Amino acid sequence: MLYKSSDRPAHKVSMLLLCHALAIAVVQIVIFSESWAFAKNINFYNVRPPLDPTPFPNSFKCFTCENAGDNYNCNRWAEDKWCPQNTQYCLTVHHFTSHGRSTSITKKCASRSECHFVGCHHSRDSEHTECRSCCEGMICNVELPTNHTNAVFAVMHAQRTSGSSAPTLYLPVLAWVFVLPLL
C-alpha cells in the first residue's frame, strides 16, 4: 500500500529525517577523524623512493644536510637527489654536548673509505662528543648516532613494500553500510 505524504504521521517522517542526518554525521566524523590521524605526524621511516628512473644500477638516496641544528630539520629539509655513483653508503656525523643536546648534524652520501672511522669520540677540551655512523640502503640514515651501540657501520636494506589501499576502500564501504538500511 502506498502512502501519500499527508497519510504518514509527522513523527515517522521526522524520525526518518533524524536517522538520515545521524547517519551522515557519523560518516563525516569517521572521514574527518581518519584524515586527521594520517596527517598528524611525519614518519621518516615510511619514506619511499619516487618512481622516477634511477640514474644508474643500484642507485640510492640518503638524507643529506650540512651542519643542521637538529635531526628533525635535517631530515625534513634534506635535498632529494640520487647519491653519486662512487658512493655506496649513507654517513651521519653527530656533534653534541655532554648533556646530549645536538650542536651539529651532517648527513651525506659516502664511500667505503669515509665509513672506516665510525664510533664515538669525546673531546675533553670542548666537552663535546662526535659520533659517526654509516649504513647501506635506501634512505637508511634516519636516526642519529649517540653512543657506541648505534655509532656503527650497519648494512640495512630498506624494505620496499607497496602501501595498502584498504583505508581508501574501507570508508566508502562503511558509509554504504550505514546509509543503506536507512533508505
UniProtKB/Swiss-Prot annotation:
It is a lipid-anchor; GPI-anchor. One of its GO terms (molecular function) is acetylcholine receptor regulator activity. This is Ly6/PLAUR domain-containing protein 6B. Disulfide bonds join C62-C90, C65-C74, C83-C109, C115-C134, C120-C131, C135-C140. Its main location: membrane. InterPro entries: LYPD6-like, Snake_toxin-like_sf. Residues 60-154 are annotated as: Sufficient for inhibiting alpha-7 nAChR currents. Keywords: Cell membrane, Disulfide bond, Glycoprotein, GPI-anchor, Lipoprotein, Membrane, Signal. A lipid is attached at S164 (GPI-anchor amidated serine). Likely acts as a modulator of nicotinic acetylcholine receptors (nAChRs) activity. In vitro acts on nAChRs in a subtype- and stoichiometry-dependent manner. However, according to another report in vitro it can weakly inhibits alpha-7 nAChRs. Residues 165-183 form a propeptide. Residues 60-151 form the UPAR/Ly6 domain. Residues 1-39 form the signal peptide. It is found in: Cell membrane. It comes from Homo sapiens. The gene is LYPD6B. GO terms for cellular component: extracellular region; plasma membrane; side of membrane. Pfam families: UPAR_LY6_2.
